[in-house]
């Protein structure tokens, strides 16, 4: 099994022992690494030249899937040695997110796109079927995005750990959406900033629903930041203060064995400011009490992180866990002591970047995106 690190793909792996294989989705392909001793050694690049949004390892079939911002899904049936296009039925839509779950004992893979549509495949990506009701919720005509072409996208997909019919997606910018019938019908979850970034149901406490949305573009009365709902999304509570160090909260996860152990990362301000400030000023934070209090993690990390952290992954095993964080500078930070101390295990590969975010922090003269 692989640890998959990408902006819109799998963020949690579990098993009896720690994983020693890492795949990083970047603007220039999937970079593969193998852990030997205390270092992560390069194993080459898969599908070079393609900007990957998402990577998923489907455990029952041992298949790998990668989605790109150039409207392709690639699949590998031999642990990454060979890849082939498998996106028939999706059309010319950018792939922003991938996820998988078991439905009736068989693997089902989901793909979220820009414009915001949701698809699924029951044959390991050989054919895809749309769940069209996602676009039949009230207000879909208001879905948008700050940067051109001003089209919303499905940024995040999550499933109920005990009921595969319950699916949540985050549409940026459109809101958090919920289905209780496997995607046949959808409702929009209100009472939270509709600039939806991520949504997650923790495996060990499915009564909770977590979501992230930036505090940088809404009033103080609107729940935003790192938020929790205990009633399926009917009401939300912000678990981070308005002056939280991370205003543009994005990737996060919950430890599968401890629902109170949370990690979140992101920039101080939104992408529209990065070019002017020449920095995203990103950070990683940890809560041990379900979000009541937070620690900004600094041990071993650069004093100032200019790049944004756009992907995080956790590998949990019996007796421990490791955290990986990928940046728009192509660096990967790593901790195996609960985030107290970090190492930069990979430097200067392709940027780990949602769409064009990395260009906001790149050389002058390039077009800025949001």
What are these regions (language model features)?
Residues 1-370:
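Extracellular glycan-interacting surfaces
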